[in-house]
Amino acid sequence: MTRLVSAEKKLRSCLLLLLVFLQPTRSAIVAHEKVSEIVQQAQRLLNTTLADGKLRSFELDGNNGAVMTQLVQPLSLQIAVMQVTAALSREMNLPKWQAMLRALGGDREVLKRFAQMRSHFALLEKRLDAGQDGGIEEQLNQITALSTSSTTWARIWQQLQTLIQEVDNLHDWFDRYQRNSAVVNERTLRDFAETVHSGFTIEKALASIHEAVCPYTMDDEDMQRPDNSSVICDGGVLETLQTALTRANDSFICSLSKSSHQLVYDLYALLTLTDAKGYAMMQFSWMLLRLYGKGSYVTETEKARIDFERRMTEKAEAAQNVLSNLTNWMWKCDTPRSEQVENETYIQFTELLQGYVVNEVDLNQDNTCKESCSAYSNSQEKGCFGNQLCAQSRRCSSGRIYNCGFIEADSNVCVTNKPGRRYDWIQYKSGRVFGQKTECNSSTSKNVKTDSWWRWVFWHCSYCMCLCDQPGPHSDRYVSLQSALAASASNRLVTGVRFVKKDRVLHIQIQEGEALPQGSVNETTLQWQPINPIKVPSGQQETAEDGLGYAALRYEERALDLDDLVAPKGHVITGLRFRKLGGHLNLEAQASPIDFMTGSIDSERAIWLSNDNTPATETNPRTKVSLLSPDVSTRSHTPSVPDSTSDQFIEFQVTSLEKDVSQNTVPFIEATPVAPEPPVWLTGIGIYHKGQPGYGGYVAFRIATLNFSDYMTVSSEEFNYTTEEDTLG
């Protein structure tokens, strides 16, 4: 900043010298040569200073109040455009400064000044054009096509697109002139300046766009817009979009690559970017016309500035009002049923608990049949009497057996060797079928007849239907408790999250990226952090006990807490991990302070967020999300919808006995990434359940994007610049 101010002071000193040299008695040739030398010297000083800033920012004299960093947020860009144009207009108001510019090709010099803002316009445009489902305009078109409440929105959006295109078409030429400022001729620039203010003027387009944001009622007496203090921007296009998003069905909302909050903010950004483009072209054109001797345009310039300032403030207030009432949480739709692939789109715990058929005679050490099936609520398999079903299917000899019950005495069991299953289906003598009956005699299955029997007259040796909890090579039941941390010391933050299974262990994997100012992220730095592998015991050493850096699920401890963790204002998410709390898996999130204007993360002051409530908590205890007779999650033909709230928990359980012979563990775990596009700071992370009645559903991550409404304030200091009226007065 010091070097920039120093350079500008030297430039001003040069200009004062210029006024001395421009005496009437001097030769015009001598004056022109001297002016060229002085201006070139000053320009070299300024260019050197700008180059030292690595083109990340440019600043005008501190007295003008114009400071530009990487202006990726629309409000900052608008303020900067207003300050830059005011400063340049004030300088040009000096007659001899104007004469100097005229002598040196002043139109191109003014064009170069405006070109200094090109990268900042381009940066915001690039962000608005990013996303896997197209840029902001394409996403807004999707709302028109897919939302069930889009009639009003479609009409307004179509009108806005036409107006935006009018401004963009002209700005494309303006941008082309800036890129070729050294060769563009005076006639071309003069035609451009006159075009901006003729016919369907930019001024009218900007006014129409703003009226769509802030509709108002004309005063019947003088047909003037009401006083600025009385304007309340209700019922505008931002509110219309909010209504369309609120009423849209879940399958549409989850298809977006950003939160509803982010989408409305991006519409606001698009409209304010368009306003800034138009205002810059209007001011540029008046400056040129003034140079070309077409008039002073002081009144027009000042009126345009006042209108632009009013529109800027009103748009920001309208956006802030809408954004404060919109959710900034984002979740993803199910992968289409036909595209589901295990360990790519979803993950499941395998054989955590599994339906298991066993005869009572094998459930006690004495091989007796004196009890009923229900007596064996927590037992073990003691043997394999008579080499019957137990000899023809995988046993549960090293595990625990729970919740036995009697169904019928005799059945046909389709035993299978498919991964993750013991049985395909069971058909009882009565004709009752559990599971989906298919051809059984094949390379992967065989039909085994089971008949209960009487031992003497008094005891019935019944086949029981139980649950088997048996660790082993077929049972993936492990969850990493290691922290997944972004490199916050290198100014990285979490930008996305997903579940990954590696070496039979479920991990949290984070996407990280470099934080940039004002909520943005350097897309070139995005990467998924490598998984730190965990080795779990195998063979005889494998148990259902927790180990170093991991938790093992088992019948007694198989619950997952469902929470939304929100960082304090001024913090972003920089890490995630699971912990064990009261036998439950419980999510923790690391939040680190961040400076909004600079994007600088203070990694030394990071904190861990968690929800310590348990089902036994006296106030606000956790409640259970129950799954009633659930089928396999991927069999649902209807997309899942969220059905849990924070402060709940869910237990991993077997699928329905009737639908699936209790062979799978549900809910499944969603493996698809949850990351906004374009990337933005994340201020919250949650785990929730989504599903449909009668199915296991999925546990999945959701994320909260930055609430921009917290930062949409315009202070009086930001309007602290000198106008032309001040200069002339």
Tell where the protein language model's regions lie, with residue ranges:
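A positional/structural detector of protein chain ends, strongest at the extreme C-terminus
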Residues: 1-5, 726-729
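Cleavable N-terminal signal peptides of Sec/SRP-targeted secreted and luminal proteins
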Residues: 3, 8-27
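Lectin-type carbohydrate-recognition ectodomains
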Residues: 24-729
